[in-house]
Amino acid sequence: NEIKDNDIFVITQKIVSKSEGMERDLNKYEFEDLIKSETKQIIRKRGDLIIAKTKHGFICANAGIDKSNIEKNKALLLPEDPNKSAHKFRSQIETASGKRVAVVISDTFGRAWRKGQVNFAIGSSGISPITNYIGKYDSFNNELFATEIATIDEIASAAELVMEKSIDIPIAIIRGLKYESSNENAEILIRDDQEDFFL
């Protein structure tokens, strides 16, 4: 199928990191040292598991460094700048296709207080990250004061349903979803420390 205007490309972090040379040989690097190199702040530690705030501002296990779906004795770091990566991929797709598209880069994170993992957007380009309902009214005519939907996170999670970890499909296209184009990116989803009730 050919690319269409307003297609949303959801691209896994793994192929972005691999394409940008973020693979590390664990015969040459200690896994703990890699975590330290990517960590801004350690939030919690239990046994071998470290919950860390990365240089990007993400709070996740082992600073987002992954050893799954990759050769043995290898580790994969997050992209240096996932939003820049998303913009690069979007520019390449638009140049090649002549169509206007959006790009979301996804990665799998755990969640506090709930079991299981979901995909989140760690980078984006060409799509508003948040759908803001503040000041609008619900179906009972109640004014909404706090509802902001993390649209690109929902897109990343929806795409995971067809990408599937075990078969490792690296790209999904979401078509037919209405969205607002924007110059903002996934960075605006990161809550400032001063606003974070749990830090």
Positions of the model-derived regions?
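N-terminal, positively charged regions that mediate nucleic acid binding
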Residues: 1-27
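A structural signal for small-residue-enriched, beta-sheet-centric alpha/beta enzyme cores
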Residues: 13, 23-73, 77, 101, ...
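Phosphate-interacting basic helix/loop segments used at nucleotide- and nucleic-acid interfaces
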Residues: 1, 80-99
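Disulfide-rich extracellular domains of secreted proteins
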Residues: 3-5, 16, 94-100, 132
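Short beta-strands and strand-coil junctions in structured, solvent-facing domains, enriched
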Residues: 18, 96, 110-112
